[in-house]
Amino acid sequence: MVNELENVPRASTLTNEEQTVDPSNNDSQEDISLGDSNEITSLASLKAIRSGNEEESGNEQVNHNDEAEEDPLLTRYHTACQRGDLATVKEMIHGKLLEVNNDGDSTEHITGLHWASINNRLSVVDFLVSQGADVNARAGALHATPLHWAARYGYVYIVDFLLKHGADPTMTDDQGFNLLHLSVNSSNIMLVLYVLFNVVSKGLLDIDCRDPKGRTSLLWAAYQGDSLTVAELLKFGASIKIADTEGFTPLHWGTVKGQPHVLKYLIQDGADFFQKTDTGKDCFAIAQEMNTVYSLREALTHSGFDYHGYPIKKWFKKSQHAKLVTFITPFLFLGIAFALFSHINPLFVIIVLFLLAIATNKGLNKFVLPSYGRMGVHNVTLLRSPLLSGVFFGTLLWVTIVWFFKVMPRTFSDEQYTNILMLVILVSVFYLFGQLVIMDPGCLPEETDHENVRQTISNLLEIGKFDTKNFCIETWIRKPLRSKFSPLNNAVVARFDHYCPWIFNDVGLKNHKAFIFFITLMESGIFTFLALCLEYFDELEDAHEDTSQKNGKCFILGASDLCSGLIYDRFVFLILLWALLQSIWVASLIFVQAFQICKGMTNTEFNVLMKESKSIGPDGLSFNENFNTTPEGFAPSIDPGEESNDTVLAPVPGSTIRKPRTCFGVCYAVTGMDQWLAVIKETIGIKDSTGHNVYSITSRIPTNYGWKRNVKDFWLTSDINAPLWRRILYPPSGSKALLNGIEVDYFKLYKLPNKDVEQGNDMV
């Protein structure tokens, strides 16, 4: 059942091209609403929720052809309101050609304010209201107000203006829909948030207000598969138990739609999947008839239930214990692998390890992952667990063990300083790894005071930036420049660089410098370990008088020290080989990070630029990915420094369709080799497959103040009174750091320092 609004273009899919809306052109519409219950014999025949006024759907507004025959002057006026032709509107009103309170057509009384509202023409709306236009005038087949018409398209700025000038949010149209219902139906999360904070939070509308069919806004959002709106409604306390006149709860309608994220939110909030409708069907029966079984099962398992809706047994009482087991598993697996390769035929070992890997994967998924704490809608997988950080820790631990018990005793007399250096590096790497795992990357606190959130929304509306790029819908704060929301930390991270699976944490403002120290020491430690192992293998060769067993057994290694290691201590040799393999991606990571620091950009900003160059999209078509409905001609005073950041983080128009990533591409990305290749291309100016010159893209980075300035900004804290060594080694103080040589607060960074201004009073 899809109501009259179902065929209206969603605010999230409107193109940036000028659009003049004439809903009279809707030839046919499937309407949302359940008709009489006797019309529905089974859910399999249920296509949509139908509205009560089926015969009026798609005919809400006047037909222009008929209107033109009746009154060409009125047609000209309404067309000007549609197109935002303020000059013509003013001319006609000031010239007394029309009266602002008598500007409706003769059939459905559609006013100029209605037309301006549904076409997002704020300047025309402002003028008409200033001339005394009735903001609560009813018109159209459903007798809707201009507020209703603006809300159905998700036009936040029009809704805000009308409410501030007397529009009544409690009024309903002939379908029984009020402002909250229509806002939810627009699927524009920004309008939903605006209404929740400025109308519902103030008690003007109940979060669970129903339409004539008994459906709440949560039920509508669940039916539409709008997970963003469902999440926000649940935060405001929307009831998951209220059923409509047919006995359908939000979970029932969510199952009809089959959107997994919606089902996850509802089930996590306590929705009853065993509850039955008036026809005696629960969610499992509905899923079978609507072919959404897979989505329901995914939501159930994600929320800790089996396919039949019963709790999955948890083998660990605490989530931390399960994560600890996942973290330790790679250490044991690597030890077994090295031991087997040391004593058994490699071909046989590969088969054994393959079977062991499958068994380990099955065991972790069945017995360990179910004990993880669930938060949000992201599936819990091994790649989203501490597994990869356990791989690194296991490698580090095995390197430490073989160095301490085997390598150091034989090489200390000849390589004292090298062994001491190895000890210092190992201690430092262990310490930094532990710190990076638990360290705050620069998380901004979420906002819980509704009054503060309302003020933030108001401020963003004033500057035309109330969208998901500037407002965090998860934490309800204004996003500072260069920040990003992290699902792992459930917070916005200042100067977000990237999520690193090897430390199971984000890298941001507060731990980025420590991360650079960490990977640099790691690479140094690997080559120090290599030098000691070569000395160790040489000692082994000297200890064995009979070296004939080396002949013909080392292949390409010849008679080198590495051959001695392979023959006399294969376990140490394999660990060294494994460590050297890690050094490849670590070296590429260091190279990429050094390049980005010199360019003055974060890893995330670099990724956005690279995705822009690889994007595939239809020519001339751009999608509103940020739910921005800023009216055309809206010209607030925006500082160039703030605006320039948009060129870095904003998606390129037409970039919503991208090349699919292969399995090899995923591995390539996890090790960071994809960025290494992109940096090489940028350095020598190679064009990508789409013909873009990567260098021409990165040259537009607004935070690039020259490589010397960028390096100083990264490595030096803003505390000019501290000694130089302290400024280099210590992380930023609180949320403050240098940018173009001046101190900025990254928690409140909404404007970038101007590149053209020479910083005379340098804080270096």
UniProtKB/Swiss-Prot annotation:
The modification Phosphoserine is found at S51, S57. Residues 342-346, 406-418, 535-570 are lumenal. It is found in: Early endosome membrane; Golgi apparatus membrane. The active site is at C500. Residues 1-321, 365-384, 440-513, 592-764 are cytoplasmic. One of its GO terms (cellular component) is Golgi membrane. It is a multi-pass membrane protein. Residues 10-27 have a biased composition (Polar residues). Its main location: membrane. PROSITE patterns: ANK_REP_REGION, ANK_REPEAT, DHHC. GO terms for biological process: negative regulation of pheromone-dependent signal transduction involved in conjugation with cellular fusion; protein palmitoylation; protein targeting to membrane; regulation of endocytosis. Keywords: Acyltransferase, ANK repeat, Endosome, Golgi apparatus, Lipoprotein, Membrane, Palmitate, Phosphoprotein, Repeat, Transferase, Transmembrane, Transmembrane helix. ANK repeats lie at residues 72-102, 108-137, 142-171, 175-204, 213-242, 246-275. InterPro entries: Ankyrin_rpt, Ankyrin_rpt-contain_sf, Palmitoyltrfase_DHHC. Residues 470-520 form the DHHC domain. Residues 1-38, 51-71 are annotated as: Disordered. It catalyses: L-cysteinyl-[protein] + hexadecanoyl-CoA = S-hexadecanoyl-L-cysteinyl-[protein] + CoA. The chain crosses the membrane at residues 322-341, 347-364, 385-405, 419-439, 514-534, 571-591. The keyword Glycoprotein does not apply. One of its GO terms (molecular function) is G-protein beta/gamma-subunit complex binding. Its EC number is 2.3.1.225. Belongs to the DHHC palmitoyltransferase family. AKR/ZDHHC17 subfamily. The DHHC domain is required for palmitoyltransferase activity. Present with 4072 molecules/cell in log phase SD medium. Palmitoyltransferase specific for casein kinase 1. Palmitoylates isoforms YCK1 and YCK2 at both C-terminal cysteine residues, which is required for their proper plasma membrane localization. Required for constitutive endocytosis of a-factor receptor STE3 and both constitutive and pheromone-induced endocytosis of alpha-factor receptor STE2. This is Palmitoyltransferase AKR1. It comes from Saccharomyces cerevisiae (strain ATCC 204508 / S288c).
